[in-house]
């Protein structure tokens, strides 16, 4: 799989937030915090599930609490998507 870029993941976060009908989704940045967008825990789970599907990654349930905003979601997804494949 080709390396995934930060811009691609951030665009994916914005698109998935828009699918969830989150106001302000298009303006989400690396600095955006979920509380600024009034994202609740169910929406966060739906966002993470969508990112897992989109980028073919698995985000552990324990990591959900560490995802407090756009930057966290992008960095975690990026690191998982660009991990070397296990042989």
Regions picked out by a protein language model, each given a short descriptive name:
Residues 2-39, 43-49, 54-87:
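Phosphopantetheine-dependent thiolation modules in NRPS/PKS and related acyl-activating systems
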């Amino acid at each position: 799989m080709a390396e995934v870029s930060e811009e691609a993941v951030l665009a994916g976060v914005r698109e998935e937030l828009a699918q969830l009908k989150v106001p302000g989704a298009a303006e989400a940045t690396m600095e955006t915090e979920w509380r600024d967008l009034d994202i609740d825990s169910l929406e966060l789970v739906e966002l993470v599930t969508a990112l897992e599907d989109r980028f073919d990654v698995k985000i552990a349930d324990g990591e959900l609490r560490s995802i407090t905003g756009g930057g966290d979601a992008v960095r975690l997804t990026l690191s998982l998507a660009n991990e070397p494949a296990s042989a």
